[in-house]
Swiss-Prot record:
Belongs to the class I-like SAM-binding methyltransferase superfamily. RNA methyltransferase RlmE family. Its EC number is 2.1.1.166. InterPro entries: RNA_methyltr_RlmE, RNA_MeTrfase_FtsJ_dom, rRNA-MeTfrase_E, SAM-dependent_MTases_sf. It comes from Marinobacter nauticus (strain ATCC 700491 / DSM 11845 / VT8) (Marinobacter aquaeolei). S-adenosyl-L-methionine binds at G60, W62, D80, D96, D121. It holds the Pfam family FtsJ. GO terms for cellular component: cytoplasm. Its main location: cytoplasm. This is Ribosomal RNA large subunit methyltransferase E. It is an enzyme of class 2 (transferase). It catalyses: uridine(2552) in 23S rRNA + S-adenosyl-L-methionine = 2'-O-methyluridine(2552) in 23S rRNA + S-adenosyl-L-homocysteine + H(+). It is found in: Cytoplasm.
Length: 207
């Protein structure tokens, strides 16, 4: 079966992508690791001893970065519907965190502790229908925000991938209602033609 032009373009980009090559050299599971590293270098979100919750963590690129940043005295709790190979210093729960059973497992691992940072690089499976894909991506990021508001400690931080499109402006407005400072980042490691940006929210205000 012949590849489509778009899949050929993706393959060519992937093969020639310097961040893909760098990830292989550095032992990261995906190029996405550099997005979190860039964001953290600018915004100083994750610090040694922090407790980080990683939503939609597979294959583990962000969890790897978070584990290095928090060090052996910190904790990373990760969750994804998909399986994820073990990472030293990361406690992983497979399942949908919106389901009560999985949510309860996460809360049990946290054991009353509140997260310093919640991170989410979640994205839906792309159908190619822009309206449907945008709706699906906004749904995921709304779920991530809801989860963050349930587990963050006061003054905690939240980072999530968001796609420009319908619902974007309203979402940013909603996040501002719960955090002292909200900025939008477009890391160098994010492909220029991608509509993705990263919302960085600091200073969580507990309702």
């Amino acid at each position: 079966m012949a590849r489509s032009k778009s899949s050929n373009r993706w393959l060519e980009e992937h093969v020639n992508d310097p961040f893909v090559k760098q990830a292989q050299q550095d032992g990261y599971r995906s190029r996405a690791s550099y997005k979190l590293l860039e964001i953290n270098n600018k915004d100083r979100l994750i610090k040694p001893t922090d407790l980080v919750v990683d939503l939609g963590s597979a294959p583990g690129g962000w969890s790897q970065v978070a584990a290095k940043l928090v060090g052996h005295k910190g904790r990373v709790v990760a969750s994804d519907i998909l399986p994820m190979d073990p990472i030293a210093g990361v406690e992983f729960i497979q399942g949908d965190f919106t389901e009560q059973e999985v949510f309860d497992q996460i809360m049990a691992i946290l054991d009353g502790a509140r997260a310093d940072v919640v991170i989410s690089d979640m994205a839906p499976n792309i159908s190619g229908v822009n309206a449907a894909d945008q709706a699906a991506s906004m749904y995921l990021v709304e779920l991530a925000l809801d989860m963050a508001c349930q587990v963050l400690k006061p003054k905690g931080s939240f980072v999530a991938k968001v796609f420009h499109g319908e619902g974007y402006d309203e979402y940013v407005k909603t996040v501002r209602e719960s955090f002292d400072k909200v900025v939008i980042r477009k890391p160098d490691s994010s492909r220029a033609r991608s509509r993705e940006v990263y919302l960085v929210a600091k200073g969580f205000r507990v309702a």
